[in-house]
Structures are given as C-alpha cells and as structure tokens.
C-alpha cells in the first residue's frame, strides 16, 4: 500500500477477543494511507484497503457494543471529510460520510481528535483543527439514525459554528461531570486591553 510504515495500532473492533491491526502507510511525503487487517480466519484479511487519511479514531459511536472507525481525509476538492466504517452483517464497511470544517493541513499539525460524550450521554468525536496557531475550529461528529453527522456544521455557512482564537486548549471534561466541554476564549473588557493579544477568559460549552 505504501513505501514505509508510519504507524501501527491494535484494536479489537468486533469484540471477539482478537485484536485487529490498523496500519498507517507512508505513501509519499504528503500522503498517508490506512489499512485494517484481521486474523479471524487464521490468515491476514484486509478489512479496509489503503484509504487516504490524516487522522483516525476508533469508538463505539452507535453504541452497539462493537467498535467503529472514523477516518479523516480530504476529498478531491481538498475539503475535509470524515468517513464512518462500521460492522454490517459481519462485514466492516464504509457506511456514511460527513463534512468537516478543518482542512487536512489544519488537522495534521496542532489538530486533535478526542473521543468524548455529549450532554445527553451520546458518544461523539471532537475534531479540532488549528489555523496558523491563531484560530481553532471544532467539529463534533456523532451517529444519529445510523448516519454520521456533524452537529456543529451550519446549513447556511457550511462551516462549524464553533470557531475561536487558539489558546492551546482542546475539548475535555474540564469539570469532571462526565460530559465533554469545548473551550471558547472570550476577550475581557478592561482598561488597557486594546492590544492585538487581549486578555481572555475561557468559557466552556457542552453540546447535545
């Protein structure tokens, strides 16, 4: 698939007690490809064949007790896409895709993907891209009615509603309540606070 191995991870995707192998291949200086292998038949079998990616995450987003795979990549126009692979009739298949705001360049450097929980307890992926260390944009991916959706993507603008100055903070459970919060820096009105880098407070938001 590629000229060299970039990364290797082990995950029990089908929860049968045997781990699958997720291999990131370095195709060239600008392109990575992800393959997923299983040994359930005693011989290596490729479940996902060399799909391009920048980041990926494994989680049980549809809460069926099995693990799914979300692959973040660029489409032919360079737009960010999240591909959702899940188990269907004992086959690991691409089920659906969702648009994300961040470009692959914004994800590859300071960007992060975090597994978390929405306000109603639904599992989700929090995808944060960083633009030139100045701005951060967060997309939230979750599964509704079997489809992967980006709950922060605006139907009007086509981008996430969660865009803020970058403060080196990322989504986390900041108050220990089991729900993942998204940081949003806000400038503090104060005397002398007129420079290019004003003092800011950090507001933390939950979503559902």
Q: What spans do the regions from the language model cover?
A:
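Beta-propeller-forming repeat regions
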Residues: 1-208
């Amino acid at each position: 698939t590629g000229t060299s191995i970039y990364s290797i991870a082990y995950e029990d995707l089908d929860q049968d007690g045997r781990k699958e192998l997720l291999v990131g291949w370095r195709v060239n200086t600008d392109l990575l490809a992800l393959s997923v292998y299983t040994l359930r038949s005693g011989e290596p079998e490729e479940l996902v064949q060399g799909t391009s990616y920048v980041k990926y995450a494994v989680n049980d987003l549809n809460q069926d007790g099995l693990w799914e795979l979300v692959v973040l990549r660029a489409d032919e126009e360079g737009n960010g896409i999240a591909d959702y692979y899940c188990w269907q009739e004992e086959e690991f298949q691409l089920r659906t895709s969702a648009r994300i705001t961040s470009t692959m360049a914004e994800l590859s450097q300071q960007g992060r993907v975090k597994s978390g929980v929405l306000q109603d307890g639904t599992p989700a992926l929090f995808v944060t891209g960083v633009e030139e260390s100045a701005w951060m944009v967060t997309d939230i991916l979750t599964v509704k009615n079997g489809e992967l959706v980006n709950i922060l993507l605006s139907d009007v603008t086509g981008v996430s509603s969660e865009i803020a100055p970058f403060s080196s903070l990322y989504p986390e459970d900041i108050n220990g309540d089991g729900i993942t919060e998204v940081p949003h820096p806000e400038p503090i009105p104060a005397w002398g606070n007129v420079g290019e880098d004003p003092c800011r407070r950090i507001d933390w938001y939950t979503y559902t």
